[in-house]
Curated annotation (Swiss-Prot):
UniProt protein name: Cytochrome P450 monooxygenase pynD
InterPro entries, per database record: CYP450_sterol_14alpha_dmase, Cyt_P450, Cyt_P450_CS, Cyt_P450_E_grp-IV, Cyt_P450_sf
Protein's job: Cytochrome P450 monooxygenase; part of the gene cluster that mediates the biosynthesis of pyranonigrins, a family of antioxidative compounds. The first step of pyranonigrins biosynthesis is performed by the hybrid PKS-NRPS synthetase that condenses 6 malonyl-CoA units to an acetyl starter unit, to form a 1,3,5-trioxotetradecane-6,8-dienyl-ACP. The enoyl reductase (ER) domain of pynA is likely to be functional during the first two rounds of polyketide chain extension, to generate the saturated C-C bonds of the alkyl side chain.
EC number in record: 1.14.14.-
Naturally occurring in which organism (per UniProt): Aspergillus niger (strain ATCC MYA-4892 / CBS 513.88 / FGSC A1513)
GO biological process, one term: secondary metabolic process
Gene giving rise to this polypeptide: pynD
Cofactors (names): heme
Binding-site residues, heme: 417
Keyword Oxidoreductase among record annotations: yes
Listed CDD domains: CYP51-like
PANTHER family: 24-HYDROXYCHOLESTEROL 7-ALPHA-HYDROXYLASE, CYTOCHROME P450 FAMILY 7
Pathway: Secondary metabolite biosynthesis
Signal peptide: 1-22
Residues bearing carbohydrate: 401
Amino acid sequence: MWRIPVIVALVAGLLYWVRKQGSQPSRKIPQPRIGLPVVGDAHAFGKSPISYIRQATARCGPVFQINLLLTKIVMLRGAQLNRFYLDTREEVWSFGDGMGLFLEKVVVPGYLSHLKEMVSSLNRGVIRSIALEHYTRIAGEEARKIATNWAEKPDIEVFEQMSRYTHRVIVRCLMGQDFYDHHLDELLDLLHRMEADIGHPFHFLLPNWVPHGPARRLHHARDRMAAIFNERLQAREQNPEKWQDSLDYIAYTLKDSRTAHLRQYFAAHHTLLMFAAHTSTVASIAWTVLELLRNPTHLEALKTALATDADIHRSPTLIATLKETSRRYSGVNMIRWARQPHQLPADAAPGKGNIVVPENCIVSISPYLTHHDPETYADPHIWDPTRWLEGGRLSETQKSNRSEVTYFPFGAGCHRCPGEQMAGMIAREMVAHMVKTYDVRWSSTGPPEDFEQLDFSRVGSAWLKGDARVTVKRDKQGMEEA
């Protein structure tokens, strides 16, 4: 019988501690205190992060703290604080530790300790000119192959099918033809299952030692990924000559002395890459298709440009089109974990004095809200590729500078995403092929009723809730050119 009062006492003690922690903010950092006491900020932020951050900024200014019960987020707003955030050293505010908050349940223990070496290998292995040329050919092949399949269907779901295309390219390029031939569909299924659970509130509200369904499912997916990699890598060992000249990224990491000894972490590394490369690349392509349908003038301008541009990857109009999509539909926030206390610039929050961000908290900025700041972008809610063009060339007027960062869908400076070039290449291949070769229209159900129903549940840029359906038929002019 003694167990019951002890358990009650422990629970009561935990609730008291949580309430006390929530009621004792950092001396210098204001809290919005929106909604119910203790849990109100966490609930409002989880329900609608964009509207919450806007409301909190109006109430508190450019620096404020969001309490999430067992942790807290220090939010920084404004172009100058964006620059300060992105220039802060990794040993002070860690991107790797920030990713670990989401990914620790889908990567094996020890991987995050080697994150720097693995990311460096991505920089070296993926952006090699010979590799990028090979990956570009693969992306073009996959675009043509899957679009032919779409044309045979009554209609398609845009985000779902762009997800399949992107996944096919990523698996062939990064993992290799053997993963593509044997595990393509299973890998996509594992990715979708992990996406469904990775952002579950339990991961933030409960300590790691508390078991729950989303964590168990993520662990199962992690273990299956590891089994797939073990199977394929063992098969490569039995036939090394076949893979000697392969240009896939796994082949590169197996040959590189700086990563070959880390093969036990390859499954975890490619799990991270699938998350990093997939969600935002899909969003870039899918939203561009939808916005071109909504804006026929821009669609015709892009068709005209692509008819004469010799190289789609240097087409100013295509680059501007995708750049505008990345601005309009970027991720809601970037996160880093504060390893050390760090003082913000003296003018970070006028009237608040010197603010020190404490250690052991999340520090965040918002690409989405920066990209929708009317002081930087006129009519920010209007999708307009011409804002990036001047006299038919790419404009430099919106470019970030040494003191401010106003555009950063892929990060900035030394914290720029190493996969940016590959993601852009994948998107350009598909969008150019669709515009030049196919007639895309809304399906019989018509366009979505509300294009502002943004889904930020994935790690990366927003998708459209409920997706959108279109028909894809080969264009007569495209048939003649083919």
